[in-house]
């Protein structure tokens, strides 16, 4: 199967309990017989690993992309076949160490151990180890990686953007998007189940005529616009673009698997 994320791990990322910059992230080698399961949550559920898990050294998070030095596992005893790599947060206890990413599309895998040294190179493309991609703003993704946005507990709001708004990957805080239409609404009944962010539809009430809504923006409201980080620009909303005419507007989120957005590949 393709590289993917563990839904339970992504729940923790969305809940702000993973700080990829300061937490001890490690990589473990799994045998070819390991079967990925969406229900796996902790290292203890993975079964046996090959060799000793290694920490990710010299981690960087730039534009929502996690990278680190290539892995060096040293000499590994012969007789095993490495089928995949799992990234996890090491709490010091395998029963509470959450698994985050499952990688089986890695250069050199599968690999039969023969007593020699094993090194695992990371992808040098745009994804590196893992990437939080659109519709998330890169700067917002950096804050998600750092655990500074808790989608369950923080004040997450949605604002309407005019069709003239031009997405810019450098946009970081609410003033960067310019004027919004109407009054931003708090997202109610939020969930992060399985690494998928969802909420109740947002009711903006009656909006004055004369504007055209092209997209919506999610942000964390800190109480000060200049420090309220942008999270995502969502264009795939039913009914958009929409010309306001004085009537009411309810933003309806997708009923598809990704809902508002998902950290688990489709």
Q: Where is each model-derived feature located?
A:
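Small cysteine-rich, disulfide-bonded extracellular modules of the LU/uPAR three-finger superfamily
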Residues: 1-83, 90-214, 221-266
């Amino acid at each position: 199967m393709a590289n993917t994320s563990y839904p339970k791990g992504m729940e923790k990322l969305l809940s702000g309990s993973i700080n990829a910059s300061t937490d001890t992230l490690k990589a473990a080698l799994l045998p070819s017989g390991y079967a990925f399961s969406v229900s796996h949550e902790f290292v203890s559920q993975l079964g046996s690993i090959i060799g000793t898990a290694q920490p990710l050294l010299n981690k960087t998070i730039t534009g929502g992309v996690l990278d680190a030095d290539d892995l060096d596992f040293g000499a590994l005893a012969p007789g095993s076949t490495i089928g995949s790599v799992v990234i996890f947060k090491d709490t010091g206890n395998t029963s509470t160490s959450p698994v985050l990413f499952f990688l089986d599309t890695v250069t050199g895998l599968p690999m039969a151990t023969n007593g020699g040294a094993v090194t695992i190179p990371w992808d040098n493309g745009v994804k590196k180890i893992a990437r939080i991609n659109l519709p998330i703003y890169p700067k917002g993704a950096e804050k998600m990686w750092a655990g500074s946005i808790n989608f369950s507990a923080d004040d997450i709001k949605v604002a309407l953007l005019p069709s003239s708004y031009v997405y810019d990957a450098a946009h970081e805080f609410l003033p960067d998007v310019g004027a919004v239409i109407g009054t931003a609404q708090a997202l109610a009944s939020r969930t992060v189940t399985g690494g998928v962010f969802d909420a109740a539809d947002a009711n903006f009430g009656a909006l004055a005529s004369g504007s055209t809504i092209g997209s919506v923006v999610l942000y964390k409201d800190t109480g000060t616009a200049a420090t309220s980080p942008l999270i995502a620009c969502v264009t795939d909303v039913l009914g958009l673009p929409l010309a306001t005419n004085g009537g009411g507007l309810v933003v309806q989120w997708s009923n598809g698997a990704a809902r508002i957005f998902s950290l688990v590949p489709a």
